[in-house]
Amino acid sequence: MKIGVMGAGSWGTTLAKVFSDAGCDVTLWARREEVAREINTEHTNSTYLRGIALPHTLTATTQPTQALCDADVVVLAVPSQTLRGNLAEWCADIPQDALLLSLAKGIEKETFLRMSEVIAEVTGAQPDKVAVLSGPNLAREIAEEQPAATVIACTNEKNAQRIQHALAAPYFRPYTNTDVIGCEIGGACKNVIALACGMASGRGLGENTLATLMTRGLAEISRLGVAMGADPRTLSGLAGLGDLVATCSSPLSRNRTFGARLGEGKTLDEARAATNGQVAEGVISSQSIARLADSLGVDMPITRAVFGVCHRDQNVADMVAALMGRTKKSE
């Protein structure tokens, strides 16, 4: 199977490696010439995956048309808030019969659309040809070939199975699901809860606090998912609970690390500077998810608290006090 991976960051490069290790013909699109050259000549991507040896069968290009040409599966590995613009540039070259696989985890800021909805809207692809990947998938660990599992969600189960077979490597086990909504909501919302866990950790708070945030965070993610039509069982699986635990617990998680810097007292700009100018996905998603929840009448207090810190200049201590001072109720 021919795979075109659009985006050579840590996650895109890792998935390109997995597809290659599973026996696929993979072309990886990189925005920067030096990244593509290094992948082709040194078989490494030191900018995003330092120390990881890439398969010699994996080729890179800076030409989108070359990566997309005759692809059976197009993997979209760009940030959620840039997906629409990138797709507008690429859609004319995406093969009509290709399956589209989204790696982005977020809700579009202005439209409140999920990533699969953005893909279908911009490309004109039928929803049953758009799939999403979600699970406890920290890129570095998978690139190191540590055993992991993931979920491929598509409303067409046969199309999900096609991607599942193409992506199955000795160290990477994909499951399938037809609940695209649940997988996308779990993937988008966990970044916000991970920010909250990072903030708590940055303030020196302990495991009880983190466990409380994760558990109650899962409860509010489930409320939103169900309100949008998700199967609640999805959110207790790999794409919900699994992804949440990994992202909230690991120092490899960009969202958790960014939150920890905010918890230590850094401003948003200072935290961004400490991460080479990158803003964690959860910072952007907290705004769109909080507003989406409001529009649906869904109570998401942790998400709203993170939104307050990131977009309303509230401090972390006040966030904790507000959460602990909420009206008492049953679980």
Curated annotation (Swiss-Prot):
Look at the named UniProt entry and state the broad enzyme category this protein falls under: oxidoreductase
Q: Which residue ranges does UniProt annotate as crossing the membrane?
A: none
* Classification via PROSITE patterns: NAD_G3PDH (PS00957)
Residues binding NADPH: S10, W11, R31, R32, K105, A139, R254, V279, E281
**Where in or outside the cell is it found?**
Cytoplasm
Which residues hold sn-glycerol 3-phosphate? K105, G135, K190, D243, S253, R254, N255
Q: What is its EC number?
A: 1.1.1.94
- Name the domain of life this protein comes from: Bacteria
Q: Does the keyword Cytoplasm apply?
A: yes
Can you quote a single GO CC term? cytosol
Name the reaction it catalyses.
sn-glycerol 3-phosphate + NAD(+) = dihydroxyacetone phosphate + NADH + H(+); sn-glycerol 3-phosphate + NADP(+) = dihydroxyacetone phosphate + NADPH + H(+)
Keywords carried by this UniProt record: Cytoplasm, Lipid biosynthesis, Lipid metabolism, NAD, NADP, Nucleotide-binding, Oxidoreductase, Phospholipid biosynthesis, Phospholipid metabolism
Pathway where this protein functions? Membrane lipid metabolism; glycerophospholipid metabolism
User: Disulfide bonds, which pairs?
Assistant: none
Which GO biological-process labels does this protein carry?
A: carbohydrate metabolic process; glycerol-3-phosphate biosynthetic process; glycerol-3-phosphate catabolic process; glycerophospholipid metabolic process; phospholipid biosynthetic process
Q: Which GO terms describe its molecular function?
A: glycerol-3-phosphate dehydrogenase [NAD(P)+] activity; NAD binding
- Residues of the active site: K190
Q: What does this protein do?
A: Catalyzes the reduction of the glycolytic intermediate dihydroxyacetone phosphate (DHAP) to sn-glycerol 3-phosphate (G3P), the key precursor for phospholipid synthesis.
* Family per record: Belongs to the NAD-dependent glycerol-3-phosphate dehydrogenase family.
Q: What is the name attached to this protein's record? A: Glycerol-3-phosphate dehydrogenase [NAD(P)+]
Q: Which organism is it from?
A: Corynebacterium diphtheriae (strain ATCC 700971 / NCTC 13129 / Biotype gravis)
